[in-house]
UniProtKB/Swiss-Prot annotation:
The keyword Phosphoprotein applies. GO terms for molecular function: G protein-coupled receptor binding. Pfam families: Arrestin_C (PF02752), Arrestin_N (PF00339). Keywords: Phosphoprotein, Sensory transduction, Vision. This is Arrestin, lateral eye. PANTHER family: ARRESTIN, PHOSRESTIN-1. Belongs to the arrestin family. Phosphorylated. PROSITE patterns: ARRESTINS. SUPFAM superfamilies: E set domains. One of its GO terms (biological process) is G protein-coupled receptor internalization. It comes from Limulus polyphemus. Plays an important role in the photoreceptor transduction. The keyword Transferase does not apply.
Length: 400
């Protein structure tokens, strides 16, 4: 009994579902997050279930749009809009004009839903900006600032016809930035110094990170070395992870402290003394839920999200929000001595799925898993865990 249950969970697939208000058109998606791998973007794949009698010769069109909101909705007056919408894809889904082979997920879903189900695929352009949401404050109203993606399928005579809400389905999706470490990447570092008037010698600060690319949830370690060749005294040290946000449309720049520590260990650093210490910080979105303006990796209503990933493919005419991160080390020397600051840039991103090498243990395990899936699908129906956008529920073919 136990092995049978384990096989049952192996073949279970989570599916997102949403139905039009009139119940005549339903859209199924296998996932809502689509990755940008740098050289290519994952396509938006799903299945459409439509009542043919309701169509009456009309067609089903689909579109993927991105909305860049750079101002608050409550400030939009007299026809002034602080948003810009771009159509990334607009195609006829039914009857389809493409001759593409459906994916395994689409085939399984079509077999389950029957002859009224039709697969569809939309390709996202490589230069499309990633999803970013600026976290709203407790008093903010309206839609949050940032870059949002939406998939919409609707019934109409032509693609130029304005969709009606009663026979259209809109689903929020996200475009995430994936990255993988480069073997040629160098350790980021910075070396700064400060001289003082009416005083000989300089204060020197060197900051080095253990690597350039970090994934969400990783700890960031900074090796700080302070050499005091001046006559001043370092009284306090502060290390922080700072998120830099650039809103390209309005040329706005924002700086938010994500994580910080303040230490007096090893202080005061008197003239002629040195200090070398490693400081570790953990930048997480969960620790900044109350901070207004923190950039996140898009925000879906169903769950939490990460901090916004670093913008890896930024160009001079980029439309969207450019994100970067720095480790900032600040030395305090009192009111007269002032401060010494060093910034070291690093990248924060989602890990790119690791491809399976043929012949490896992972490859053999996946092949065995696929073999068991095929065998089980022949012996019993495959279960689908369907998550409705309006409410969550589960159903199985065995109970239908």
């Amino acid at each position: 009994m136990i092995p049978l249950l384990s096989l049952f969970y192996i073949v279970a697939v989570k599916v997102f579902k949403k139905t039009a208000p009139n119940g005549k058109i339903t859209v199924y998606l296998g996932k809502r997050d689509f990755g940008d791998h740098g050289s290519y973007c994952e396509p938006v794949e799903g299945v459409l279930l439509v009542d043919n009698e309701y169509l009456k010769g009309r067609k089903v069109f689909g579109q993927v749009t991105t909305t860049f909101r750079y101002g608050r909705e409550e400030d939009e007056v007299m026809g002034l809009h602080f948003s810009r919408q771009l159509y990334l894809a607009l195609e006829q889904v039914l009857p389809t004009k493409k001759n593409e082979a459906p994916s395994d997920f689409q085939n399984r879903l079509v077999r389950k839903l029957g002859t009224l189900a039709h697969p569809f695929t939309f390709a996202l352009p490589e230069n499309a900006p990633p999803s970013v949401t600026l976290q709203p404050g407790s008093e903010d109203q309206g839609r949050p600032l940032g870059v949002e993606y939406e998939l919409k399928l609707f019934i109409a005579e032509t693609e130029d016809e304005k969709p009606h809400k009663r026979n259209s389905v809109s689903m929020a999706i996200r475009k995430l930035q994936y990255a993988k470490p480069s073997p040629l990447a160098k350790q980021p570092s910075a070396l700064v110094s400060k001289g003082f008037m009416m005083s000989s010698g300089k204060l020197q600060l060197e900051v080095t990170l253990d690597k350039e690319l970090y994934f969400h949830g990783d700890k960031v370690s900074a090796n700080v070395t302070i050499s005091n060749y001046s006559k001043k005294t370092v009284k306090n040290i502060k290390v922080a992870v700072v998120q830099n946000t650039e809103v390209t449309m309005v040329n706005g720049h924002f700086h938010k402290t994500i994580s910080s520590i303040e230490s007096k260990e090893g202080c005061p650093i008197t003239p002629g003394a040195t200090l070398s210490k490693v400081y570790t910080l953990l930048p997480l979105a969960s620790q900044n839920k109350d901070k207004r303006g923190i950039a996140l990796d898009g925000m879906l209503k169903e769950g939490d999200t990460n901090l916004a990933s670093s913008t890896l493919n930024s160009t001079g005419d980029a439309i969207g929000i450019v994100i970067s991160y720095v480790i900032r080390v600040r030395l305090y020397m009192g009111a007269i001595g002032g401060e010494l600051v060093a910034d070291v840039s690093f990248k924060l991103a989602n890990p790119e799925p690791v491809p399976v090498v043929p012949g490896s243990q992972e490859s053999k395990a996946q092949q065995e898993k696929a073999r068991m899936k095929k065998q089980l699908s022949r012996e019993m129906s495959t279960d689908l865990i369907v998550e409705d956008f309006a409410r969550r529920r589960q159903f199985s073919e065995d109970n239908e």
